[in-house]
Curated annotation (Swiss-Prot):
Its main location: secreted. Residues 86-101 have a biased composition (Basic and acidic residues). GO terms for cellular component: extracellular region. Residues 103-116 have a biased composition (Low complexity). Residues 30-185 are annotated as: Disordered. The keyword ATP-binding does not apply. It is found in: Secreted. This is Uncharacterized protein DDB_G0274485. Keywords: Secreted, Signal. Residues 117-135 have a biased composition (Gly residues). Coiled coil: none annotated.
Length: 185
Protein backbone atom coordinates (compact mmCIF):
# COMPACT_ATOMS: atom_id res chain seq x y z
CA UNK A 1 0.00 0.00 0.00
CA UNK A 2 2.83 2.34 0.91
CA UNK A 3 4.57 1.49 -2.36
CA UNK A 4 1.45 2.46 -4.33
CA UNK A 5 1.28 5.80 -2.57
CA UNK A 6 4.94 6.45 -3.33
CA UNK A 7 4.44 5.58 -7.01
CA UNK A 8 1.40 7.84 -7.27
CA UNK A 9 3.28 10.67 -5.60
CA UNK A 10 6.22 10.27 -7.98
CA UNK A 11 3.84 10.34 -10.95
CA UNK A 12 2.20 13.55 -9.77
CA UNK A 13 5.57 15.23 -9.21
CA UNK A 14 6.76 14.20 -12.68
CA UNK A 15 3.55 15.51 -14.23
CA UNK A 16 3.85 18.87 -12.50
CA UNK A 17 7.45 19.29 -13.65
CA UNK A 18 6.50 18.61 -17.27
CA UNK A 19 4.45 21.77 -17.54
CA UNK A 20 5.88 24.09 -20.16
CA UNK A 21 6.82 27.41 -18.68
CA UNK A 22 7.53 29.27 -21.91
CA UNK A 23 4.23 28.69 -23.68
CA UNK A 24 1.79 31.53 -24.17
CA UNK A 25 -1.43 29.69 -23.49
CA UNK A 26 -4.48 31.86 -24.27
CA UNK A 27 -6.29 30.05 -21.48
CA UNK A 28 -3.98 31.78 -19.03
CA UNK A 29 -5.58 35.09 -19.88
CA UNK A 30 -8.89 36.04 -18.37
CA UNK A 31 -11.18 38.44 -20.14
CA UNK A 32 -11.48 41.81 -18.50
CA UNK A 33 -14.27 44.34 -18.98
CA UNK A 34 -15.08 45.43 -22.50
CA UNK A 35 -15.80 49.12 -22.92
CA UNK A 36 -17.35 50.51 -26.07
CA UNK A 37 -18.82 53.91 -26.69
CA UNK A 38 -19.72 56.00 -29.69
CA UNK A 39 -19.43 59.68 -30.39
CA UNK A 40 -21.65 61.94 -32.46
CA UNK A 41 -20.16 64.02 -35.23
CA UNK A 42 -20.84 67.56 -36.22
CA UNK A 43 -24.03 68.41 -38.01
CA UNK A 44 -23.77 69.10 -41.70
CA UNK A 45 -25.27 71.80 -43.84
CA UNK A 46 -28.89 72.83 -43.57
CA UNK A 47 -31.39 71.73 -46.20
CA UNK A 48 -33.44 74.28 -48.05
CA UNK A 49 -37.16 74.57 -48.44
CA UNK A 50 -39.58 75.64 -51.13
CA UNK A 51 -42.47 77.94 -50.52
CA UNK A 52 -45.82 78.33 -52.19
CA UNK A 53 -45.72 81.01 -54.84
CA UNK A 54 -49.21 82.17 -53.91
CA UNK A 55 -48.95 82.91 -50.20
CA UNK A 56 -45.25 82.35 -49.46
CA UNK A 57 -45.97 79.87 -46.67
CA UNK A 58 -43.32 77.46 -45.43
CA UNK A 59 -45.29 74.29 -45.91
CA UNK A 60 -43.31 71.23 -44.73
CA UNK A 61 -45.07 69.21 -47.41
CA UNK A 62 -43.32 71.32 -50.01
CA UNK A 63 -39.80 70.86 -48.73
CA UNK A 64 -37.42 70.22 -51.56
CA UNK A 65 -34.20 68.28 -51.52
CA UNK A 66 -31.56 70.59 -50.20
CA UNK A 67 -27.83 70.09 -49.67
CA UNK A 68 -26.90 66.73 -48.22
CA UNK A 69 -25.97 67.03 -44.56
CA UNK A 70 -23.54 64.62 -43.00
CA UNK A 71 -21.49 64.17 -39.88
CA UNK A 72 -19.07 61.68 -38.47
CA UNK A 73 -18.11 60.55 -35.00
CA UNK A 74 -15.75 58.16 -33.34
CA UNK A 75 -15.83 55.98 -30.25
CA UNK A 76 -13.34 53.93 -28.35
CA UNK A 77 -13.34 50.57 -26.64
CA UNK A 78 -10.93 48.05 -25.28
CA UNK A 79 -10.41 45.33 -22.75
CA UNK A 80 -8.00 44.61 -19.98
CA UNK A 81 -6.87 40.97 -19.72
CA UNK A 82 -5.45 39.71 -16.47
CA UNK A 83 -2.79 37.03 -16.42
CA UNK A 84 -3.46 34.15 -14.06
CA UNK A 85 -1.02 32.91 -11.48
CA UNK A 86 1.42 30.66 -13.35
CA UNK A 87 3.06 29.55 -10.12
CA UNK A 88 0.09 27.27 -9.53
CA UNK A 89 0.79 25.58 -12.86
CA UNK A 90 4.43 24.77 -12.32
CA UNK A 91 5.81 27.94 -13.85
CA UNK A 92 9.25 29.12 -12.85
CA UNK A 93 9.87 32.68 -11.89
CA UNK A 94 12.06 34.59 -14.31
CA UNK A 95 14.78 36.18 -12.21
CA UNK A 96 16.60 37.64 -15.20
CA UNK A 97 14.30 40.64 -15.37
CA UNK A 98 13.25 43.17 -12.83
CA UNK A 99 9.97 42.20 -11.27
CA UNK A 100 7.13 44.72 -11.13
CA UNK A 101 6.40 45.68 -7.56
CA UNK A 102 2.73 44.81 -7.96
CA UNK A 103 3.61 41.27 -9.02
CA UNK A 104 5.83 40.33 -6.10
CA UNK A 105 3.08 38.23 -4.57
CA UNK A 106 2.34 36.36 -7.79
CA UNK A 107 -1.07 37.94 -8.16
CA UNK A 108 -2.55 39.23 -11.41
CA UNK A 109 0.65 38.77 -13.35
CA UNK A 110 0.33 41.55 -15.88
CA UNK A 111 -2.48 43.91 -16.70
CA UNK A 112 -2.99 45.45 -20.09
CA UNK A 113 -5.55 47.73 -21.63
CA UNK A 114 -6.14 48.60 -25.25
CA UNK A 115 -8.46 50.87 -27.14
CA UNK A 116 -9.86 50.96 -30.65
CA UNK A 117 -11.83 53.48 -32.60
CA UNK A 118 -14.67 53.47 -35.08
CA UNK A 119 -16.33 56.04 -37.25
CA UNK A 120 -19.59 56.43 -39.08
CA UNK A 121 -21.43 59.01 -41.11
CA UNK A 122 -25.04 59.80 -41.80
CA UNK A 123 -26.62 61.87 -44.53
CA UNK A 124 -30.06 63.03 -45.42
CA UNK A 125 -32.04 65.91 -46.77
CA UNK A 126 -35.57 67.20 -46.75
CA UNK A 127 -37.90 66.25 -43.94
CA UNK A 128 -36.44 62.80 -43.32
CA UNK A 129 -32.94 61.42 -43.19
CA UNK A 130 -30.83 58.70 -41.68
CA UNK A 131 -28.04 58.23 -39.20
CA UNK A 132 -25.04 56.11 -40.09
CA UNK A 133 -23.07 53.93 -37.72
CA UNK A 134 -19.68 52.29 -37.97
CA UNK A 135 -17.26 50.29 -35.91
CA UNK A 136 -13.53 49.68 -35.96
CA UNK A 137 -11.60 46.51 -35.22
CA UNK A 138 -7.89 46.21 -34.84
CA UNK A 139 -5.22 44.15 -33.11
CA UNK A 140 -2.58 44.97 -30.56
CA UNK A 141 0.26 43.00 -28.97
CA UNK A 142 -0.46 41.83 -25.47
CA UNK A 143 2.46 40.88 -23.25
CA UNK A 144 1.91 38.76 -20.15
CA UNK A 145 4.29 40.89 -18.11
CA UNK A 146 7.91 40.37 -17.16
CA UNK A 147 7.26 37.97 -14.33
CA UNK A 148 7.57 34.54 -15.94
CA UNK A 149 9.47 32.78 -18.68
CA UNK A 150 6.70 33.39 -21.19
CA UNK A 151 7.13 37.13 -20.80
CA UNK A 152 9.01 37.33 -24.09
CA UNK A 153 6.03 35.94 -25.99
CA UNK A 154 3.48 38.40 -27.24
CA UNK A 155 -0.10 37.43 -27.82
CA UNK A 156 -2.10 39.34 -30.40
CA UNK A 157 -5.60 40.01 -29.14
CA UNK A 158 -8.41 41.71 -30.96
CA UNK A 159 -10.61 44.41 -29.58
CA UNK A 160 -13.49 46.34 -31.01
CA UNK A 161 -13.86 50.05 -31.07
CA UNK A 162 -17.12 51.79 -30.37
CA UNK A 163 -19.46 52.81 -33.15
CA UNK A 164 -19.34 56.31 -34.53
CA UNK A 165 -22.57 58.09 -35.36
CA UNK A 166 -23.18 60.81 -37.91
CA UNK A 167 -26.18 63.08 -37.93
CA UNK A 168 -27.67 65.76 -40.12
CA UNK A 169 -30.04 68.65 -39.84
CA UNK A 170 -33.63 67.90 -40.64
CA UNK A 171 -35.60 70.57 -42.41
CA UNK A 172 -37.60 72.69 -40.01
CA UNK A 173 -38.88 76.20 -40.22
CA UNK A 174 -36.08 77.31 -37.92
CA UNK A 175 -33.04 75.90 -39.69
CA UNK A 176 -33.93 75.70 -43.38
CA UNK A 177 -32.68 78.05 -46.02
CA UNK A 178 -34.94 79.67 -48.56
CA UNK A 179 -34.07 78.17 -51.91
CA UNK A 180 -36.40 80.38 -53.88
CA UNK A 181 -39.90 80.37 -55.19
CA UNK A 182 -41.07 76.98 -56.37
CA UNK A 183 -43.73 76.74 -59.04
CA UNK A 184 -45.68 73.85 -60.43
CA UNK A 185 -47.02 72.41 -57.16
Amino acid sequence: MLLKLILILCFLVTLSLSVKVDSADPALFTQGPTIASGGTGNTGANPCYGHDDEDGSKDPAMFTQGPVSSGSGSGSGGYCPHHKNRAQEGGKKDTTKEQPKENNNNKNLGRHSSSGSGSGSGSGCGVTGDTGTGSGRTTAPVNDGVTYKSSNVKETEQYRGGAGRGKHNQATEENVQDCGEITGW
